[in-house]
C-alpha cells in the first residue's frame, strides 16, 4: 500500500493560500484603486493644462473656442472623482468620472462632453481620451505592483 508523508511546510502553504483566497476581493479593490488614482491624476493634469479664455475673448473671437473659462476648468477639476467599487460577477469595477456643476451652474458633464466631441462653439479637444490612453501603461504597472505587495504581505 502506498504511503504519503506530507512535509509540515505544506500545511502552512495551504493555510496561506486559503487566507489569500479569502482576502482576494480586498486585494483586487486596493489594486484597482491604485490604477484608478493614476488615471484620475492624469485626467486632472490634462484638464489643468487646457487654455483659459475670458468671457470677453470668447465673445470677440468668431472662431470656435479651444479652451475653457476659469470657472469651467475649476468646476471640472472639483467634479472629477473615482466612484465606489462595484462587483459585477467576478469583476470589480471602478469608474472615473465628472459630476456636479460649476460656479455658473453649468453641468460639468456637458462641458467635458463638448470638449471630447467638439461642437459648433468649441473645437474638439479629447482630454479624457488622451489622458486615459497615456496613463494606461502606468496604471497597469501600478495595479501589478500593488497586487504583488498585497500578496507578499499576506503570504510571508
Region spans (language model):
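Short, Lys/Arg-rich flexible segments
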Residues: 1-95, 99-156
Amino acid at each position: 500500500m502506498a504511503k504519503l508523508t506530507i512535509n509540515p511546510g505544506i500545511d502552512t502553504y495551504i493555510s496561506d493560500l486559503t487566507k489569500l483566497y479569502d482576502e482576494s476581493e480586498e486585494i483586487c479593490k486596493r489594486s484597482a484603486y491604485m490604477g484608478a488614482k493614476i488615471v484620475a491624476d492624469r485626467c486632472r493634469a490634462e484638464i489643468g493644462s487646457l487654455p483659459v479664455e475670458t468671457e470677453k475673448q470668447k465673445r470677440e473671437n468668431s472662431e470656435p473656442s479651444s479652451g475653457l473659462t476659469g470657472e469651467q476648468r475649476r468646476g471640472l477639476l472639483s467634479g472629477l472623482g473615482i466612484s465606489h467599487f462595484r462587483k459585477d460577477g467576478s469583476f470589480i469595477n471602478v469608474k472615473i468620472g465628472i459630476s456636479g456643476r460649476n460656479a455658473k451652474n453649468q453641468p460639468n458633464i456637458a462641458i467635458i462632453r463638448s470638449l471630447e466631441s467638439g461642437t459648433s462653439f468649441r473645437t474638439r479637444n479629447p482630454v479624457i481620451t488622451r489622458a486615459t490612453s497615456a496613463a494606461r501603461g502606468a496604471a497597469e504597472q501600478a495595479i501589478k505592483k500593488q497586487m504583488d505587495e498585497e500578496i507578499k504581505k499576506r503570504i510571508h
